[in-house]
């Protein structure tokens, strides 16, 4: 007889916590959120306080630990308790944004750039996993969809800064996000490579329409 990796004490507790949270805080409010076309930010904070936003992310970056099986348990429990696919995608949009930032922070640490790594971790990654900020991934564009080879968004160096020009569309959490991971081309990347920039949505020139 083999052990079921999905049925450990810890994962049963995670499933119960997730199902209870969903039944109390998400499922009863879905129709109201649909009518308002917005999920309150307080729900993100509550998920962060419960440790659910951090499942699958290492504790040293502000996560709750766990692996892909824990993420699967979380997802199945949340949807099984009545959350819609749209609510799940919106509440966990960081799942397609934060991994890129963690990778960048790790690379900066290896390169000896502790300032850059600390900025990514302390100003972006940890606040998102705590539910204090909302993150989104900006790839899809109005004309070319998600064809990254033909991205029209460009990032041009300007002294110590970068100027980004372009438009994104159909971005999950796009109207609520505090930070974007934006896919661009740069003068050095060419069309075969994509450069990702962490962009604070409060910066001048950033608009949501």
Q: What are the residue ranges of the model-derived segments?
A:
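Intrinsic disorder at enzyme termini
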Residues: 1-12, 155
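A non-catalytic, amphipathic alpha-helix used as a structural packing/dimerization or gating element
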Residues: 10-24
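Buried hydrophobic positions in well-ordered alpha/beta secondary-structure cores of metabolic enzymes
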Residues: 22, 51, 58, 74, ...
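C-terminal helix-coil-helix/basic helical segment that borders enzyme active sites and/or dimer interfaces
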Residues: 27-38
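A short, Trp-centered hydrophobic/proline-enriched beta-strand micro-motif
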Residues: 131-139
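A short core secondary-structure module
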Residues: 165-207
């Amino acid at each position: 007889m083999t052990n079921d990796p999905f049925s450990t004490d810890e994962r049963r507790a995670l499933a119960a916590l997730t199902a209870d949270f969903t039944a109390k805080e998400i499922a009863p409010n879905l129709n109201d959120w649909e009518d308002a076309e917005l999920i309150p930010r307080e729900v993100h904070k509550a998920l962060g306080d419960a440790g659910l936003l951090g499942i699958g992310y290492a504790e040293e970056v502000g996560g709750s630990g766990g692996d892909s099986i824990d993420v699967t348990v979380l997802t199945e429990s949340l949807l099984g308790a009545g959350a819609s696919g749209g609510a799940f995608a919106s509440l966990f949009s960081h799942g397609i944004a934060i991994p890129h930032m963690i990778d960048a922070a790790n690379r900066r640490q290896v390169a000896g750039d502790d300032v850059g790594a600390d900025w990514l971790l302390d100003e972006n990654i940890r606040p998102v996993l705590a539910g204090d900020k909302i993150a989104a991934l900006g790839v899809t564009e109005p004309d070319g969809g998600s064809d990254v080879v033909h991205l029209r968004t460009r990032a041009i160096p300007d002294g110590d800064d970068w100027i980004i020009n372009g438009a994104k569309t159909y971005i999950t959490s796009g109207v609520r996000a505090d930070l974007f991971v934006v896919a661009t081309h740069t003068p050095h990347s060419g069309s075969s490579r994509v450069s990702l920039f962490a962009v604070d949505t409060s910066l001048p020139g950033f608009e949501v329409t």
